[in-house]
Amino acid sequence: MIWQKPFPDNRITGHYGTLSDYRRKMKMQPHSGTDWAMKAGTPIPAIARGTVVGIFESKILGHVLVQRVQDKNKKIWFIGYCHLHKKPTLKEGDRVGAGETIGLVGNSGSASTGAHLHATLSKTIKGVFGPTSVKFDLYKAIEENK
């Protein structure tokens, strides 16, 4: 079960668990995912092999695709790919290999920092939309599952 970063580290603009001045001023929770800034319309490679288990639209996260994956210890996780450019063409039940296109980078929802992929990691589908307290550091998990 090899996991991979969707984009280079130098494209990261938001780290899991950070509390920027803006987030503090707006009385927001710490950042709940990892953000990679990319040009709108850039294909997003799947972080890991898995199955599409949800396609959602959220006022905050915009177009979202949720993928069920396993780590190297065979534990089940859910990766949320958020702020997609448009509704993904993939459907629930589709199998996606690591590196295959999962959607396109966008700024749907309340993506206030421009086009980027906001990716989250949770133990449940609903957790993808929850606060930091029900999420995990996706970047760290990728490093541990290379």
Question: Where are these predicted regions, by residue range?
Answer:
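Conserved beta-strand positions that form and line the central face of beta-propeller blades
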Residues: 35, 66, 80-83, 104, ...
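Surface-exposed, glycine-biased beta-strand/turn segments
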Residues: 1-63, 72, 98, 111
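Extended aliphatic helical segments
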Residues: 52-53, 64-69, 96, 105, ...
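Beta-rich strand-turn-strand
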Residues: 65, 88-114
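Sec/Tat-exported extracytoplasmic proteins
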Residues: 40, 56, 88, 105-109, ...
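Zn2+-dependent peptidoglycan hydrolase active-site motif and core
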Residues: 47-88, 114-116, 120
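Acidic, glycine-rich catalytic/binding loops that coordinate metals and/or anionic ligands
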Residues: 1-8, 37, 76-77, 91-100, ...
